[in-house]
Amino acid sequence: MPWLQLRINTTRELAPRVEYAMAKSGSLAVTLQDNADHPIFEPALGETPLWQETRIVGLFEADTDTTAILELVLKKSGLSEAQHQWHILEDKDWEREWMTHYQPIQCGPGFWICPSWTAPPDPQAVNLMLDPGLAFGTGTHPTTFLCLQWLAGENLANKTVIDYGCGSGILGIGALLLGAVSVTGTDIDPQALMATQENVKRNNLPAESFPVYFPDKCPENPVDIVLANILAGPLVELAPALSALLKPGGRLCLSGVLETQKDDLLAAYEPTVEIEQVFQREEWICITGTRRALKSAKE
């Protein structure tokens, strides 16, 4: 059965009113989109920005009275008129549609990320079989790829790891397959913790090798490697905590950061971490370094 989309173009200032009106007028879902190709990569702390030209898209059932719904949306938003368009959305198996576009990715020599529904291109390689589910982390995003590429070049034999903001578990599972002895995962999203556990099982790894926790329950024992692919704001705030999770000489890998945010990250971590490399892919970067030796009380 097809669906109907009502698309209303508006300004940043009016967008919340139109969004509220759409939600109160029987829409099954409401989405806000950029209407002028002005990307917002990450809001500043405490902000929830919108695009100056914003498109509000409401999803309605196919038998919707379009005239009546438009009038109701305008009335509830307090507008006399609005630039709008009704669009027919053909019904599809969206999960299958998405699956056709997700292909194996090589992240290093002999190291592949493969969707669980495809055969690995190189059966003899280290193949991480992944079903992302509802959490982030498929290997396609530049930040995930940069972290995986770094892991592929490290000696992980018998290393202990924390995957902070584990999402689908892709980084931690990659570390285990590349030789790490154990990974501790943490995330604020329960769906992410579930996806991680499912992907651990999918890769035939023992559940005890990758326990997962909410951040307030995560063990604080220092480890050899900390991976954190989240956002710049949280990474800056978490600098003392993430540094404290590293043994002296332990390795840190940070991503989820735009090149324009590099200086803020470096300033936050340089007191405790010797920054070694900054990798870049498109506009995103990955920062790696080594935990400095702890200062003695006499120092």
UniProtKB/Swiss-Prot annotation:
Subcellular location: Cytoplasm
SUPFAM superfamilies assigned to the protein according to its UniProt record, in alphabetical order: S-adenosyl-L-methionine-dependent methyltransferases
Pfam families reported for this sequence: PrmA (PF06325)
InterPro entries attached to this UniProt entry: Ribosomal_L11_MeTrfase_PrmA (IPR050078), Ribosomal_PrmA_MeTrfase (IPR004498), SAM-dependent_MTases_sf (IPR029063)
EC number: 2.1.1.-
Protein function: Methylates ribosomal protein L11.
Record's protein name: Ribosomal protein L11 methyltransferase
Organism from which the protein derives: Teredinibacter turnerae (strain ATCC 39867 / T7901)
Lineage per the UniProt record: Bacteria, Pseudomonadati, Pseudomonadota, Gammaproteobacteria, Cellvibrionales
